[in-house]
């Protein structure tokens, strides 16, 4: 790790970041932070401004206005100082195909001013951590699969023991097995360094990240832990109920325990069974008692199950919001 320095309240700060290209605004009034040791998912539709924001934070692009800091150091006022604390792996990270893995990482360690006495040690360490020693040692980068090239990119990012790592789409184009390996690798960084990661694979973000920041059209629409966002953005609980009762009979029982309950039109399945969707307020006590209520009433039931909302549902709800609603979250 870099030389000891006071622990800042936030490892990464974006404050009112704005980036304009003439009349086109790519990022507008965007504010969020990443705490030391925290893994944060940075999400948004295509063209939302994610890569632009990451480039501004990494110092590879200047913003039009606003403030960006890495470990308390201004990216605009002291870019070299900020970059000493930072590693950035862009989307489609280019690598020299005619170099061997160890050669490339050794060169990168020297370029990053790793102490000469520690270069070999650091190369061995990141190769071990990224599962490259056993699978890629001595091989040309051009001979590696895309998954292992991504590992080389992440190993490069970790060489100088940065306090902050920014990863733009690190799992793009990988198969499920490769994605799992990268996910475990990123998860292992928790507590050691702050990680900001963008990805379109929402399930992986949900598995790895402590919280998420969601932007749309360059503006913040939601941020926080997924459990908190689920309560905020998805205020209803849905149940699938398969029964032989009529919609009116089911609705009467549901509204008896929760007046705000609704029963959506059913879909006939087979042998007289119908599949309904029952919707309750998310905080309703009836969520805990609905199954017991229906069974106690003698309702013929084949299935009752509560819907589980994931990050995809949160993402869809968030990207339908206005920026003003996002700032209030």
Model regions and ranges:
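Conserved NTP-handling cores and scaffolds of large molecular machines
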Residues: 112, 193, 212, 233, ...
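ABC transporter nucleotide-binding domain
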Residues: 183-281
């Amino acid at each position: 790790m870099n030389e000891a320095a006071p622990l800042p309240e936030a490892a990464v700060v974006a404050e009112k970041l704005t980036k304009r290209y003439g009349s086109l605004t790519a990022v507008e009034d965007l504010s969020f932070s990443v705490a030391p040791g925290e893994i944060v998912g940075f999400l948004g539709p295509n063209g939302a401004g994610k890569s632009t924001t990451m480039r501004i934070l990494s110092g590879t692009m200047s913003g039009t206005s606003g403030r960006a800091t890495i470990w308390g150091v201004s990216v605009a006022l002291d870019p070299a100082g900020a970059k000493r604390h930072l590693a950035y792996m862009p989307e489609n990270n280019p690598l020299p195909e005619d170099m061997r893995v160890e050669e490339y990482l050794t060169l990168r360690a020297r370029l990053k001013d790793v102490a000469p006495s520690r270069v070999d040690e650091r190369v061995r360490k990141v190769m071990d951590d990224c599962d490259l020693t056993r699978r890629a040692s001595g091989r040309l980068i051009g001979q590696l699969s895309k998954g292992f090239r991504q590992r080389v990119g992440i190993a490069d990012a970790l060489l100088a023991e940065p306090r902050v790592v920014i990863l733009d789409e690190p799992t793009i184009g990988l198969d499920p097995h490769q994605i799992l390996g990268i996910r475990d690798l990123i998860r292992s960084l928790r507590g050691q360094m702050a990680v900001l990661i963008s990805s379109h694979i929402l399930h992986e973000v949900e598995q790895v990240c402590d919280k998420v920041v969601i932007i749309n059209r360059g503006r913040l629409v939601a941020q926080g832990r997924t459990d908190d966002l689920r309560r905020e953005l998805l205020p209803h609980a849905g149940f699938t109920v398969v029964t032989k009762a009529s919609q009116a009979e089911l609705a009467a029982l549901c509204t008896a325990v929760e007046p705000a309950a609704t029963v959506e039109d059913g879909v006939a399945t087979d042998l007289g069974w119908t599949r309904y969707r029952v919707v309750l307020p998310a905080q309703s006590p009836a969520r805990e008692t609905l199954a017991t209520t229906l069974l106690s009433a003698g309702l013929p039931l084949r299935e009752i199950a509560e819907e589980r909302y994931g990050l995809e549902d949160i993402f869809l709800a968030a990207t339908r919001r206005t920026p003003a609603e996002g700032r209030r979250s």
